[in-house]
Design a protein with these regions (language model features):
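Glycan-processing catalytic domains of CAZymes
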Residues: 1-306
Length: 306
């Protein structure tokens, strides 16, 4: 039906003038490290949980990044730990008061000063995604060498939102040969976590754990009228995978995300249509909140799915 490019390639000049229908991959959240590096506060984030650690006598130290690729993530030590992190006694199921623990930045660990002996504890924390997980996947699988790690930025946040709309218009004006813009995809990636050896540690194509930030969560709280807890996402470490019965709070969060994402999708597809081009969506990758089987998708303005 059409000729296209793909991740890791550039469209050859020889094919631009042959009169064929052309569609081009377009990345809304990456392939612009200059912007990402200039605006680190609007880097994408995710929730992650540590393994279970058992207390004995005295304080318990829980390292946050054990089992997680440091190429992929780094601890968000910028936002308020007490507000957005959660330390839970998994033996009782109760969260600890923020006064009962502290963060040691030098070791990237949480220290519980007086845990209950032989109880198990976890830490749920926010981490910045410093390498787009799909780009990491493509790089690892294809054994790409000397490739700059693409940093994903959060289109939901104010500065990046405004920049993204301007960037899309500039792209359309500089690519007149493109007939179809194939968004790959929109704003939030499914849950994809790698370990220190670049192995896939946890994958859930329907996971919402990488669609979070304090900015987004504050908006969610205003809409639903109750306080957000990391446990709504973490779900005892199951991350609300499709074998779990979702809580009311998690379903509220999903519905909120779909409404917000579909509205932002419409903003971008309207721009594409204004330039006389079609808007196509890749089914996968950054598709959280874009699920075509949910009712909110109908208002997104997408012309096709591939």
């Amino acid at each position: 039906d059409a000729i296209r490019d793909c991740d890791g390639t550039e469209f050859p000049q020889e094919l631009k003038d042959i009169g064929a229908k052309i569609y081009a991959t377009y990345y809304t959240t990456r392939k612009d490290n200059a912007w990402a590096k200039a605006n680190p506060d609007e880097t994408q984030q995710c929730y992650i949980m540590t393994p279970f650690y058992t207390a004995a006598d005295g304080a318990l130290t829980i390292p946050l990044m054990t089992g997680i690729s440091r190429e992929l993530m780094k601890v968000n030590d910028h936002d308020d730990f007490a507000r957005w992190w959660e330390v839970i006694d998994r033996t009782t199921g109760e969260p600890l008061d923020a006064a009962a623990w502290h963060y040691d930045a030098a070791t990237e660990s949480v220290v519980i000063d007086a845990p209950a002996a032989y109880h198990e504890y976890t830490v749920s924390f926010l981490a910045y995604l410093i390498w787009d997980p799909v780009h990491m996947y493509n790089s690892v699988i294809n054994d790409w060498k000397d490739v700059e790690h693409q940093i994903p930025f959060d289109v939901r946040q104010p500065k990046t939102h405004a920049y993204t709309m301007r960037r899309l218009r500039e792209y359309l004006e500089s690519h007149p040969y493109v007939n179809v813009v194939r968004f790959t995809t929109f704003f939030h990636l499914f849950t994809l976590v790698f370990d220190e050896l670049r192995r896939e540690k946890y994958v859930d194509w329907y996971g919402y754990s990488a669609s979070v930030s304090p900015y987004i969560l504050e908006q969610f709280e205003k809409e639903v009228g109750y306080k957000f807890r990391p446990e709504f996402i973490i779900d005892q470490g199951y991350y609300n995978n499709q074998y779990r019965v979702p809580s009311k709070e998690y379903k509220d969060f999903q519905a909120f995300q779909r409404r917000e994402v579909s509205g932002l999708m419409k903003e971008m597809t309207d721009i594409v249509h204004a330039y006389g081009k079609e808007a196509m969506m890749f089914l996968g990758d950054h598709w959280i909140g874009c699920e075509p089987f949910m009712p909110e998708f109908q208002q997104s303005g997408v012309d096709a799915i591939v």
